[in-house]
Amino acid sequence: MLQYALVFFVIALIAAVFGFGGIAAGAVEIAKILFFIFLIVALVTAVMGLVRRR
């Protein structure tokens, strides 16, 4: 479960680089939205993984 959290976090970082760095000017808003979506999914997945281990 924590592997999924790491994957979603990496995807969020990639979306942040494209969205906040201005690399993809046409897709800035989409990349910003994807960053926050994948960041939330990564956090939820990490919490679920930690709760299941107990």
UniProtKB/Swiss-Prot annotation:
One Pfam family per UniProt: DUF1328
Predominant location: membrane
Source species, domain of life: Bacteria
Gene Ontology, cellular component aspect: plasma membrane
Record keywords, A-Z: Cell membrane, Membrane, Transmembrane, Transmembrane helix
Topological category with respect to the lipid bilayer: Multi-pass membrane protein
Membrane-crossing segments per the record: 5-25, 30-50
Subcellular location: Cell membrane
Annotated InterPro entries: DUF1328 (IPR009760)
Keyword Zinc (UniProt): no
Family according to the record: Belongs to the UPF0391 family.
Protein name: UPF0391 membrane protein Reut_A0124
Originating species: Cupriavidus pinatubonensis (strain JMP 134 / LMG 1197) (Cupriavidus necator (strain JMP 134))
